[in-house]
Design a protein with these regions (language model features):
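Short, flexible beta-strand-to-coil junctions
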Residues: 40-46, 163-167, 509-512
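Generic structural hydrophobic/aromatic packing signal, biased to beta-strands
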Residues: 22, 39, 160-162, 176-179, ...
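ABC ATPase nucleotide-binding domain signature region
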Residues: 55-63, 67-73, 78-91, 95, ...
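Intrinsic structural disorder/low-complexity segments
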Residues: 52, 58-61, 302-303, 392, ...
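RecA-like P-loop NTPase motor core
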Residues: 284-327, 332, 402, 419-422, ...
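Extended helical coiled-coil dimerization/tether regions that scaffold
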Residues: 117-186, 236, 249-257, 264, ...
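Switch/communication elements of ASCE P-loop NTPase nucleotide-binding domains
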Residues: 170-233, 341-473
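Long, basic/Gly/Ser/Thr-rich N-terminal segments
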Residues: 1-153
Length: 516
């Protein structure tokens, strides 16, 4: 294949035939490298195919060298160079050209997803870890990209478990949670839920999962352990990437630091109020201020505008526009904006500032998830319902599930909201409970996907529901009254349909007891 490199802003000629163009992109990686190009291919009939973003590295790049010294024209890159597509869609677009075109283009560009030996050599180069793998994990290259580059599928089947740490000085077996993901299932099985009352240890379980995956010196007896398999288990690592999401001001577990070099290990990103590390006084940094969260959002939206992330971000925003406030704010219009970086960030922050706190959290979280979620990512969310009303929570869960399916990832949500249960099947739900120091978990007895919230509440919380709130008031009134009419009169007739049904059931149960 004949290749020509075009300078930034220069377009291919209209009469191009049977050749490929690399359009120079000035995207900057950490002020160290400019390795990005856009690949456009013209067939023999002159039809153009925009393949997507690709980064090109060079063995032995000199200190201060920002761009690989590739020739302006070539048929095949020589062995000094190597390349990597920046998204699974890059390889899917190549597949659409047919296996002959795909294989020729990948070979001529020395693609490391096609050549595993070349990838292992490239991993030793600094430009690979800092630039080529900035938005891609090694697991994506060796797993999803490898499959697609050979015409294979893009989704994996997961089956794994997490065993919590054993309580100190206890003979009690720790709780063990099992998870399974089946590609293309309906309803989707890529989001799992831990539900239970406050204080049962849901947040502690998520924190243990985080430390078990990315804690540098963590011991299994302190943080627990994962076991399991996927179709692409690499280097004994179940997941390649972990994203932790929590906006609780009372979260006792501080975040771990993010990493710039992504050439090895499980990658980690934190989304929330807390900041990693300690201040000059040795104390944890204070939570992020609204202005700081706005800055985080401005930086993230700019990253989400690049390459294939832009289409994922647009789709997520459109799904969130099921909420009328998001729709009125036209948040999805951000994804189609072509302003320069400074103006774009300013517009994004202005839109962000006009939203309520709950809508800000959803928009920031979804944007950061689009930025950070890659192949084989585990997303851990702690009580997302704390800031969201039910319809917005449902829209967020659906957008998250859609993103995770696209990225071949898994989500685990800790919650006490039955609204979350409505969005997943019971095979993806663990009811968590605690007795003294013993934590246990069971599956729901009823199907949860699309079930009534009241029924789900009773299924999860059982007697806790009837011993609190309006249930207790109704039960006390029935025990002090002689009949249905008197109970209704006591509440001035201000009773909903469910309350009236509960009163009748309580009176019937009371009468049956008297007969005995």
């Amino acid at each position: 294949m004949y290749f020509r490199v075009l300078d930034h802003g220069v377009r291919p000629p209209a009469d191009a035939r049977a050749r490929a163009y690399l359009l120079t992109d000035n995207w900057d990686d950490w002020f160290k490298y400019n390795t990005m190009y856009t690949l456009v291919v013209y067939n023999e009939e002159g039809a153009s195919h925009s393949i997507g973003s690709v980064k090109i590295g060079q063995f032995g790049m000199e200190e201060g060298q920002r761009r690989p010294a590739i020739p302006k024209t070539f048929d095949t890159l020589n062995d000094r160079f190597f390349s990597l597509g920046q998204d699974d869609s890059y390889y899917e677009e190549l597949n659409a050209l047919g296996p002959e075109y795909r294989d020729r283009l990948l070979r001529d560009l020395k693609d490391v997803a096609l050549d595993t030996e070349l990838f292992q050599r490239a991993l030793k180069e600094k430009v690979t870890g800092v630039s080529l793998l900035r938005a891609v994990t090694p697991a994506s290259v060796q797993g999803q990209f490898y499959r697609i580059a050979r015409g294979g599928t893009r989704l994996s089947r997961y089956k794994f478990s997490y065993t919590a740490p054993k309580p100190p000085r206890s003979r009690i077996n720790p709780v063990r949670l099992e998870f399974a993901v089946k590609p293309e299932s309906q309803p989707p099985t890529n989001i799992h839920v831990l539900i239970g009352r406050n204080g049962v240890g849901k947040t502690r379980l998520l924190n243990g999962m985080t430390r078990a995956l990315v804690g540098a010196a963590a011991e299994d007896e302190d943080v627990g352990s994962f076991e399991g398999e996927t179709e692409d288990l690499l280097d004994d690592r179940l997941f390649a990437n972990l994203v932790s999401v929590t906006f609780s001001a009372f979260d006792p577990f501080g975040p771990l630091p993010d990493r710039q070099d992504k050439s090895s290990g499980v990658q980690y990103a934190y989304i929330g109020l807390r900041r990693s590390g300690l201040g000059e006084d040795g104390e944890p940094h204070p939570p992020r201020t609204p202005d700081q969260l706005s800055s985080v959002f401005g930086r993230s939206v700019w990253l989400c505008r690049q390459g294939a992330r832009a289409s994922r971000w647009r789709r997520a925003l459109e799904m969130l526009e099921a909420d009328p406030i998001f729709k009125d704010a036209e948040v999805a219009s951000l994804a189609g904006n072509d302003l320069p970086e400074k103006e774009f960030r300013a517009r994004a922050r202005t839109l962000f500032s006009k939203l309520s706190s709950g809508h800000k959290i959803v928009l920031l979280t979804m944007t950061r998830l689009v930025e950070t979620v890659e192949e084989r990512t585990l997303v851990l969310l702690d009580e997302p319902e704390a800031h969201l009303h039910p319809p917005l929570l449902s829209a967020f869960i659906r957008a998250l599930s859609d993103l995770l399916i696209n990225r071949n990832g898994v989500g685990i949500i800790a919650t006490h909201s039955p609204v979350v249960l409505q969005e997943v099947p019971k095979s993806c739900v663990w009811k968590v409970r605690r007795t003294n120091i013993r934590v246990e978990a069971d599956r729901p007895e009823i199907e949860t996907f699309g079930e009534n919230v009241g029924i789900l509440t009773r299924e999860v919380f059982g007697l806790e529901v009837t011993d609190s709130g309006f249930h207790k008031m109704l039960r006390d009134a029935v025990s002090d009254s002689v009949g249905y009419g008197e109970v209704v009169d006591r509440f001035g007739g201000e009773l909903g349909g469910e309350a009236k049904a509960i009163i009748r059931a309580l009176i019937a149960a009371q009468s049956a007891g008297d007969d005995d």
